[in-house]
Amino acid sequence: MSRLQTRFAQLKQENRAALVTFVTAGDPDYASSLEILKGLPAAGADVIELGMPFTDPMADGPAIQLANIRALDGGQTLARTLQMVREFRSGDSETPLVLMGYFNPIHHYGVERFIAEAKEVGVDGLIVVDLPPEHNEDLCHPAQAAGIDFIRLTTPTTGDQRLPTVLEGSSGFVYYVSVAGVTGANAATLEHVEEAVARLRRHTDLPIGIGFGIRSAEHAAAVARLADGVVVGSALIDRIAKARDNAQAVKDVLALCGELAEGVRNAR
């Protein structure tokens, strides 16, 4: 079993959802970002999504757009992001780590080279937000052939006719974007989330993670009662933006992760 399969199976036995945390590689700088990354599992993160900085993150709201700018201004590249995963893996062989971002940097890096290096450093999955199922041959199938999960996004506007196409070839888990729009937007109602999870379960046996708009331990707990995973990104990245310095940013992100983890663990 893959690290993602193992983690979700373990949490199912514990009857709780996974806390999935998103941070951008290189934000606020390389050293602080690596410190955050290494600290997240102990703070309660069950799965980590690591953003690959890009100049035009069109699906992301202001918080993550600014995180991309901070990281790129600090010299973060795709090669340095893969190096960061390697350094993380040297001390953690169990926590699943998923790279999330856009196809353009991967295309410029070289798809074959990227997949080979991602596999070597210990990447477990990919979320590439601007690569629809019609382009599975470009990255999804080669990644899966190398043993890297390809995680699909579904949204409130993904209809029942489209869902099987989106889910075909998906692996690891399904990421349900609970608000149609950019990351960090207002949260969806719990009733809406419950209906969406039920609809997705009719189409897939994969674990379902819910993201976009989750900002507090209480909200994370409420979503954790409905889904297999609770994804939090913008709320963590806001802590970096508001911190007085990078050392404070590390502390604040890990503190919020701890609060969210407590909410998720006490949800059921």
UniProtKB/Swiss-Prot annotation:
Disulfide bonds: none annotated. Its EC number is 4.2.1.20. The active site is at E49 (proton acceptor), D60 (proton acceptor). Coiled coil: none annotated. One of its GO terms (molecular function) is tryptophan synthase activity. GO terms for cellular component: cytosol. Pathway: Amino-acid biosynthesis; L-tryptophan biosynthesis; L-tryptophan from chorismate: step 5/5. One of its GO terms (biological process) is L-tryptophan biosynthetic process. Keywords: Amino-acid biosynthesis, Aromatic amino acid biosynthesis, Lyase, Tryptophan biosynthesis. Pfam families: Trp_syntA. Gene3D superfamilies: Aldolase class I (3.20.20.70). It comes from the Bacteria. SUPFAM superfamilies: Ribulose-phoshate binding barrel. PROSITE patterns: TRP_SYNTHASE_ALPHA. It catalyses: (1S,2R)-1-C-(indol-3-yl)glycerol 3-phosphate + L-serine = D-glyceraldehyde 3-phosphate + L-tryptophan + H2O. Transmembrane segments: none annotated. The alpha subunit is responsible for the aldol cleavage of indoleglycerol phosphate to indole and glyceraldehyde 3-phosphate. Tetramer of two alpha and two beta chains. Belongs to the TrpA family. This is Tryptophan synthase alpha chain. It comes from Pseudomonas aeruginosa (strain ATCC 15692 / DSM 22644 / CIP 104116 / JCM 14847 / LMG 12228 / 1C / PRS 101 / PAO1).
